[in-house]
Amino acid sequence: MSITAERKQELLKEFATANADTGSPEVQVALLTERIKNLTEHFKEHQKDNHSRRGLLKLVSQRRRLLDYVKRKDEARYQALIEKLGLRR
């Protein structure tokens, strides 16, 4: 259910702006998106897991705040990020 270390490294390489970049909003959004996808798969099998559903809503809200921040700072980076991640907005 959690992200493997290999997958996390792939995401870091793909979205990092610098070599050792782990804290940029793009990387954070990519990691949150991966966790949200994993939880969404979990809910296909465990529909009544309300405890994890609350965690999912928390992750979605956190991702939304980070995306709003990126959009406020640089619209082009925001558009590139949502295009790369395949998000709807």
Swiss-Prot record:
<comment type="function">
    <text>One of the primary rRNA binding proteins, it binds directly to 16S rRNA where it helps nucleate assembly of the platform of the 30S subunit by binding and bridging several RNA helices of the 16S rRNA.</text>
</comment>
<protein>
    <recommendedName>
        <fullName>Small ribosomal subunit protein uS15</fullName>
    </recommendedName>
</protein>
<keyword id="KW-0699">rRNA-binding</keyword>
<keyword id="KW-0687">Ribonucleoprotein</keyword>
<dbReference type="Pfam" id="PF00312">
    <property type="entry name" value="Ribosomal_S15"/>
</dbReference>
<keyword id="KW-0694">RNA-binding</keyword>
<dbReference type="GO" id="GO:0003735">
    <property type="term" value="F:structural constituent of ribosome"/>
</dbReference>
<comment type="similarity">
    <text>Belongs to the universal ribosomal protein uS15 family.</text>
</comment>
<dbReference type="GO" id="GO:0019843">
    <property type="term" value="F:rRNA binding"/>
</dbReference>
<comment type="subunit">
    <text>Part of the 30S ribosomal subunit. Forms a bridge to the 50S subunit in the 70S ribosome, contacting the 23S rRNA.</text>
</comment>
<comment type="function">
    <text>Forms an intersubunit bridge (bridge B4) with the 23S rRNA of the 50S subunit in the ribosome.</text>
</comment>
<dbReference type="GO" id="GO:0022627">
    <property type="term" value="C:cytosolic small ribosomal subunit"/>
</dbReference>
<dbReference type="InterPro" id="IPR005290">
    <property type="entry name" value="Ribosomal_uS15_bac-type"/>
</dbReference>
<dbReference type="InterPro" id="IPR000589">
    <property type="entry name" value="Ribosomal_uS15"/>
</dbReference>
<dbReference type="InterPro" id="IPR009068">
    <property type="entry name" value="uS15_NS1_RNA-bd_sf"/>
</dbReference>
<dbReference type="GO" id="GO:0006412">
    <property type="term" value="P:translation"/>
</dbReference>
<keyword id="KW-0689">Ribosomal protein</keyword>
